């Protein structure tokens, strides 16, 4: 009877160990919040031959330099309308030459606007071996060899999961499943509403070390760097050379699909030599440009003199307006402190989304594996080694250490901002510190419970062997419970930070 209870307890604990080894181990290595923030960033080089941006986007003959447009695309001086808001329209824009970048990053700024609550069909960003000037896949050709990032506006499969951003790769032999929105072919996806936003929507697509990452700026703020995580695909192989492109299409419903800019950067890993610059211009061209610059400079100086003569009352500025007052300086310091807190919370939220996305994939794969083993191999015994258990314990210690570092950093930031606003008040800092202490105690309790389970089920004179896998329970599993506790803890920390910020912002008006 005791042996049966011990085997059942080990079988329930084993999925927890597997999940911790997969997700928390990766968390500590640096892919999540616990990563080293001082990791060197790749070198970025702007590639103008694979980019466009207004104003003066088109030439006198209506073409875009280094790009070819087809279908119903309409270039203008400040943007390219890839597909207008008319029924059954298709358009695309592609680079004329192939790019041969090992790692790259593109930043696309666009608008999708329409009258109705629902729009169609959508917009796609491409990296493909050949140009797909026209076709049925969002205005581009099917059977492409490369990757497409689809901003799908219309819900063809009726599952109410649109607008959505979907990453689909193809080797040139697979037809796109348009009726099901490519659900069975998607490598990764996220649901984001990119239609009718007050500011342009921005997409940052990075292909670095065989990993494709999509970040989205949802267009609610004018901040160009306010990106949030959307999707990531690891171990992705794409053609060594390919064309960048954008396409769009409309159906029975129609939206305007406008692309304001497409900026391409070549990435070079740290430690490697950056790409050699292009051939320098000749001396004759340099002299020509220098003469033009001097001519424009003289015209500018002349215009300045004319303006000063015509507006003598605007010359000069009172001395007291040049320097900021004590109140202005304190207000600026308060705003800067709040802005730093906002940026840190936003960065934590972005990294939390990436961690949750990875954990979601790990839990789903783990659940499928357990179901397969339980259904197909009911008599086979698993085995867990001492090394795996030690790895779990070390991982827990490392996570606790990093949570403590995060707590100290955020507590110090809150203390400084509260001190600037109310030097004599320490109640807000004490309350925040007390909340962090409570969170730390809860984490220690969870760690102690897991250690007790490990020690209780590990006799010193025998190696641990896992018994048969029990039938998959219908109630809440241990893995889902741990994930729920972790998510709830992180959300609680975020709520405390947000409430402290709101209280501090409210106090300064009294």
UniProtKB/Swiss-Prot annotation:
GO biological process terms held by the UniProt record: blood coagulation; endoplasmic reticulum organization; endoplasmic reticulum to Golgi vesicle-mediated transport; Golgi organization; negative regulation of protein targeting to mitochondrion; positive regulation of organelle organization; protein folding; protein transport
Tissue note: Ubiquitous.
Modified sites of kind Phosphoserine: 425
Sites where the protein binds Ca(2+): 152, 154, 156, 181
Signal peptide range in chain numbering: 1-30
Residues in compartment: Lumenal: 31-477
Subcellular location per the Swiss-Prot or TrEMBL entry: Endoplasmic reticulum-Golgi intermediate compartment membrane; Golgi apparatus membrane; Endoplasmic reticulum membrane
Domain L-type lectin-like: 44-267
Post-translational events: The N-terminal may be partly blocked.
PROSITE patterns: L_LECTIN_LIKE
Complex formation: Exists both as a covalent disulfide-linked homohexamer, and a complex of three disulfide-linked dimers non-covalently kept together. Interacts with MCFD2. May interact with TMEM115. Interacts with RAB3GAP1 and RAB3GAP2. Interacts with UBXN6. Interacts with SERPINA1/alpha1-antitrypsin. Interacts with BET1.
Function recorded in the entry: Mannose-specific lectin. May recognize sugar residues of glycoproteins, glycolipids, or glycosylphosphatidyl inositol anchors and may be involved in the sorting or recycling of proteins, lipids, or both. The LMAN1-MCFD2 complex forms a specific cargo receptor for the ER-to-Golgi transport of selected proteins.
Protein name: Protein ERGIC-53
The species this protein was found in: Homo sapiens
